[in-house]
């Protein structure tokens, strides 16, 4: 089968005789594609250097996964799907080219799925994973049986992906390398646009904005774009968008406007004014933070557009279980320290790795728990991001009470002098005293204990492998975390 036939193939209906190999199968998007294809009946294999929750799940389902890259792995493949993170000199890619085995990008495979469905693509610099999860939960809990492939684990199904049998296909659309231009959705949600992954856009923010505009202008005339008009970059491209647009935000001009926002602990509530609806909507959301109110409003706008009853929207968001590593409450850390008796601290795990995301998380914690001592354990993600947003990081990271900085998670990038953790540590140290460079993560407790006073929140922050600290250093027992 050549690549053009593959791209026209209806994988939901055709005979399931193809053997498909995924290089980089451990990634959230790639593992989701593997799960969907396997559940459709195709013979799936994959390779990666990393073993994680999803690879274990896929192996238990019966998918053959190799934890090394070798040309032997692709011997029987009819075609190959690759993650954009896989370099061109990968031995499996080189072997596939030599044997003329068709190679598809992850986003190209998403489009193959999407072309036979009502495609819903969620993109933006921040919030797309949570928004995708919310849209899925609203549809799924109301028996609309969507298919979803998300960038994070949806807690209600304990998976990144699920095969449904309705017309709806929801996908998180990755803007980081422009590959979302492969998609042709019926509906697109853009949460925000900020300078990130800017090296993939020749260092030009205007090129990133233009790429988002090009993506939105692929929506057909009968489709719709749902956009957050609190974001300046979205406002900038808004007049050039050709399809129907629904706007949302705190902005007074938004069609779906958030008012009367309040939060307490892990719950937020707000009133949603819908200018084209007869009634306002009172929302209780099982997540704190104004940014999550925005994510929920994007999902509400879509659900309203799909004529889902208000009560069902309300109940879905009230019962929303969240997404793994997105402001995720892990448990309590009970302190064994002579100066502190019978005290425990909260442990929160968050994937945010951009200064704006860090700022929103800090603001959310300060609003719900203003008197808590906030300790952040932060792992910078990518040298290029650290370099490009260096002074923003210094400003935001200086706002926590105590900061522990791990080494940069490189994501296969080369070292950049002045964009490393020591540089961040040195410059933040000029502003605040309570900052520590963690050179040995196995000794994290030794670094952490002096900063605890018994009234603390420990925030584990970053997109790399920082979450393994929870599993390797803290012991989970009876839903509580103990030293």
Swiss-Prot record:
Similarity comment: family membership: Belongs to the MurCDEF family.
List of residues binding ATP: 124-130
Native species: Buchnera aphidicola subsp. Schizaphis graminum (strain Sg)
HAMAP family assigned: MurC (MF_00046)
Name listed for the protein in its UniProt record: UDP-N-acetylmuramate--L-alanine ligase
Signal peptide (residue range): none
EC number from the UniProt entry: 6.3.2.8
GO cellular component annotations of the record: cytoplasm
One Pfam family here: Mur_ligase
């Amino acid at each position: 089968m050549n690549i053009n036939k593959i791209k026209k193939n209806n994988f939901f209906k055709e005979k399931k005789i193809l053997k498909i190999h995924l290089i980089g199968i451990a990634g959230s998007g790639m593992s989701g594609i593997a799960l969907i294809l396997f559940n459709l009946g195709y013979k799936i294999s994959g390779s990666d250097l990393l073993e994680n929750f999803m690879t274990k799940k896929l192996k238990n389902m019966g998918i053959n996964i190799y934890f090394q890259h070798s040309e032997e792995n692709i011997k029987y493949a009819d075609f190959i799907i690759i993650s954009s993170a896989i370099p061109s000199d990968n031995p499996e890619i080189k072997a596939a080219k030599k044997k003329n085995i068709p190679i598809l990008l992850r986003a190209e495979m998403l489009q193959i799925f999407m072309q036979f469905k009502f495609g819903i693509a969620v993109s933006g610099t921040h919030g797309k994973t949570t928004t995708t999860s919310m849209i899925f939960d609203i549809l799924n809990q109301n028996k609309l049986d969507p298919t979803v492939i998300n960038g994070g684990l949806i807690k209600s199904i304990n998976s990144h992906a699920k095969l449904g049998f309705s017309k709806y296909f929801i996908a998180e659309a990755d803007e980081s390398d422009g590959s979302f231009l492969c998609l042709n959705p019926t509906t697109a949600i853009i949460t925000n646009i900020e300078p990130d992954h800017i090296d993939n856009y020749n260092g030009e923010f205007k090129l990133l904005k233009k790429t988002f505009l090009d993506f939105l202008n692929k929506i057909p005339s009968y489709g719709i774009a749902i956009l957050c008009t609190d974001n300046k970059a979205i406002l900038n491209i808004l007049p050039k968008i050709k399809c129907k647009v629904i706007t949302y935000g705190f902005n007074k001009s938004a069609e779906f406007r958030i008012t009367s926002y309040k939060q307490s602990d892990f719950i937020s509530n707000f009133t949603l004014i819908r200018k084209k609806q007869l009634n306002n909507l009172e929302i209780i959301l099982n997540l704190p933070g104004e940014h999550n109110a925005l994510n929920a409003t994007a999902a509400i706008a879509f659900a309203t557009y799909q004529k889902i009853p208000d009560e069902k929207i309300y109940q879905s968001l009230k019962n929303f279980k969240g997404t793994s590593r997105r402001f995720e409450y892990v448990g309590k850390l009970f302190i064994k320290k002579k100066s502190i008796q019978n005290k425990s601290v909260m442990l929160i795990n968050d994937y945010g790795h951009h200064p704006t995301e860090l700022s929103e998380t800090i603001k959310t914690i300060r609003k719900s728990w203003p008197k808590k001592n906030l300790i952040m354990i932060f792992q910078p993600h990518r040298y290029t991001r650290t370099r490009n947003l260096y002074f923003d990081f210094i400003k935001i990271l200086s706002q926590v009470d105590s900061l522990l900085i791990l080494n940069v998670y490189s994501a296969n990038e080369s070292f950049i002098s002045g964009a490393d953790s020591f540089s961040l540590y040195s410059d933040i140290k000029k502003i605040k005293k309570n900052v520590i460079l963690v050179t040995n993560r196995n000794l994290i407790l030794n670094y952490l204990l002096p900063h605890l006073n018994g009234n603390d929140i420990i925030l584990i922050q970053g997109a790399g492998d920082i979450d393994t600290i929870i599993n390797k250093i803290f012991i989970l027992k009876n839903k509580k975390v103990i030293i």
